[in-house]
Amino acid sequence: MHQRRFELIRKPELEGSSFLFNDVEVRYVATCPETGISFYCSNGHGGAIGVRVYPNGRKALAGICGAKYGKPYAHGKSEYLNFKNAFGHNKGIFIHHAVYTAWVGPFDKPYIDHKNGITTDNRWENLEPVTGTENSRRAGILRGLRATGINPAELPFDVLDKYLAPEAQKDPKTVMDHDLKNHCEN
C-alpha cells in the first residue's frame, strides 16, 4: 500500500462550499478522511449528480437526475462527469479536479496528473498540478516503466516523486536505477 505523506484532517469549512469549473457547480457535502469526500455537481439547468470518492481513490455515483437537457452521465470507468447545458452543449468536470480542490485548494496549472498513472485512483496524495508538457512527459515515463516490468502503482510515492522529477530525466538511468532496484528486490 502507498505511504501517506500528509495527515488528512476533516475539513468542515468546505462542507456546503462550492466552486464553478467549466460552468459546472461543485458543492461539497462532506469531507472526512475515514469515509472519503462527498460532493454533487450541478449544471444549473436541472442536471445533478452525487459523487463519493472513497479513501482508496475509487468513486461511486449516486443520485443522477436531470431535466431534458440537464441529465449528466459518466462514461463507464471514465473519471469525467458530463453535462449538457440548456443549449445542448457538453460541459463537464473531472472528478480528480474536485478532489484536489477539496483537499489541497485551487490549482495554478492547467492539468492535474495522477502520479501513478492510474486515472481511477483519485486519492489526493496521488494528484499533482502539472503543465501540458509535464503531463505528456510523465505519461511517457510511466509507459517506459511498465515496459520494463515495473508497475508504477506499486512504487511508494517518495520513489515515484523522485523518478518523475524533471532533474531525474536528464539521466534517469544513473539517478533512479538504485531506488528502483531496491524497491523491486524488496
Question: Where do the protein language model's features map onto the residues?
Answer:
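Conserved recognition-core residues within compact binding domains
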Residues: 1-111, 118-175, 179, 183
